[in-house]
Amino acid sequence: DLEKVIAEYKETAFDKIKQFTKVQFLHWTEEEFSSCFRKMMTLEQYREPQMAQLYQNYLASGPLAYMEALFSGMLGDAEKARQTALDFYGPIFLLYSIYDGAEDKSHVIKLLEEHMDHFLQEMQIS
């Protein structure tokens, strides 16, 4: 039936969101060049407008807009999609800083996975 098809589509979409998000997080934290570039953009965004734009595109408004578009397609509600994207991406953005200061990096990856599982489970319920 149609509800089952929609539920399966959402589950597939959630799995892809989780995979994509984890790959991006690992890219910006564990790959040496990307991690150093992220840290440089974080510092230089306040001195160089070009770096500020790159920072926004790669780490702030760019990922938020991408998630908003995904959630808009899934939810069919642009206003709800914006808030959902903020709720989803905000903690992930914070985890970049936590990761940088953590001795146990694997614990931060676990926090990322738990956040995504909890968030997407809550989203499926509502």
Where are these regions (language model features)?
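N-terminal hydrophobic signal/anchor transmembrane helix of membrane proteins
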Residues: 1, 6, 10, 20, ...
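Amphipathic alpha-helical packing segments from all-alpha helical-bundle domains
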Residues: 15, 29-42, 49-75
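Helix-loop "lid/cap" segments that line or gate small-molecule binding pockets
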Residues: 7, 22-29, 38-46, 119-122
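Short, polar/charged, Gly/Pro-enriched helix-capping and turn/loop motifs at alpha-helix termini
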Residues: 31-34, 102, 126
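Alpha-helical elements of Rossmann-like donor-binding domains used by nucleotide-donor carbohydrate transfer enzymes
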Residues: 19, 23, 40, 66-69, ...
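Hydrophobic/aromatic-rich alpha-helical bundle segments in the mid-to-C-terminal region
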Residues: 53, 57, 61, 71-120
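Hydrophobic alpha-helical connector segments
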Residues: 2-34, 81-88
